[in-house]
Amino acid sequence: MAHPAQLGLQDATSPVMEELITFHDHALMAMSLISLLVLYALFSTLTTKMTNTNITDAQEMETIWTILPAIILVLIAFPSLRILYMTDEVNNPSFTIKSIGHQWYWTYEYTDYGGLIFNSYMLPPLFLNPGDLRLLEVDNRVVLPIEAPVRMMITSQDVLHSWTIPTLGLKTDAVPGRLNQTVFTATRPGVYYGQCSEICGANHSFMPIVAELIPLKIFEMGPVFTL
C-alpha cells in the first residue's frame, strides 16, 4: 500500500504490475537522458559563443535528430504495447466476480457461488478501530484468491466510475450500460486498497475499494466470510 511521502510506485502484487514497474523505470531512464541532453545543449548555447551565422543547413545533424528520436520512440513503444495486450488477455479464468459501481459504494456479485451479492460502503470515521485507515476502510471487503486467474466484470448503475487497485495494476472503467472486464492473478496474500478513480459526484472521494487476497484453498471453501 502507499505510505506518507512515498516517491515510488507501490509494491507489485501481480505480474502485470511488475511489468508496469519495469516499464516505468525503462521509460523514466530514457526521458531522463533526453532531458539531460537538452539541458546540456541549452546551457552550452547560453554560456558559450560557439555560433556560426553562415551555416544555412546541416543535413547530417537533421538526419541524426530525426532518426534518433524515432529509435527512442520505438524502444518505448514495444514494451508498452506488450503490456497493453497482456492486460487484455483473457485465458480461462478460474473465477468470475462482478463489480457494480453506484453513487457512492460498490456492489459485488460472486457469480460462481450461487450469485452471492453484497454491498461495500466506506466506514465512517466514528466506526474506525485503532490502526484502520481513514477514508479507505469498508464494511465488507471483496475477498479474492491468489495464484489463480480472476476475471472482474465491471459496470455501473448510474454514472461513470473506475475500479482501481494500484498494487494489482488494475484500473477499469465502470460504464453504465456496458460490461468491461479485466483479468489478474495475485501473487501475495494481504489486504490491498484502492479508490474510485473517475470523478463521479460529491462523494467521489468516499468510495474506497478493499480487496482481501487469501490462499486459493481457503477461498474455495466459499466466500461467505466476507459478510
Swiss-Prot record:
A GO cellular-component term linked to this record: respiratory chain complex IV
Source organism superkingdom: Eukaryota
Binding-site residues, Cu cation A1: 161, 196, 200, 207
Topology Mitochondrial matrix: residue spans: 46-59
Cofactors that this protein relies on: Cu cation
EC annotation from Swiss-Prot or TrEMBL: 7.1.1.9
Membrane topology: Multi-pass membrane protein
Record carries keyword Membrane: yes
GO biological process, one term: ATP synthesis coupled electron transport
Record-linked PROSITE patterns: COX2, COX2_CUA, COX2_TM
SUPFAM superfamilies per UniProt: Cupredoxins, Cytochrome c oxidase subunit II-like, transmembrane region
Listed transmembrane segments: 15-45, 60-87
Function: Component of the cytochrome c oxidase, the last enzyme in the mitochondrial electron transport chain which drives oxidative phosphorylation. The respiratory chain contains 3 multisubunit complexes succinate dehydrogenase (complex II, CII), ubiquinol-cytochrome c oxidoreductase (cytochrome b-c1 complex, complex III, CIII) and cytochrome c oxidase (complex IV, CIV), that cooperate to transfer electrons derived from NADH and succinate to molecular oxygen, creating an electrochemical gradient over the inner membrane that drives transmembrane transport and the ATP synthase.
Record family assignment: Belongs to the cytochrome c oxidase subunit 2 family.
Protein name: Cytochrome c oxidase subunit 2
Organism: Mandrillus leucophaeus (Drill)
Gene: MT-CO2
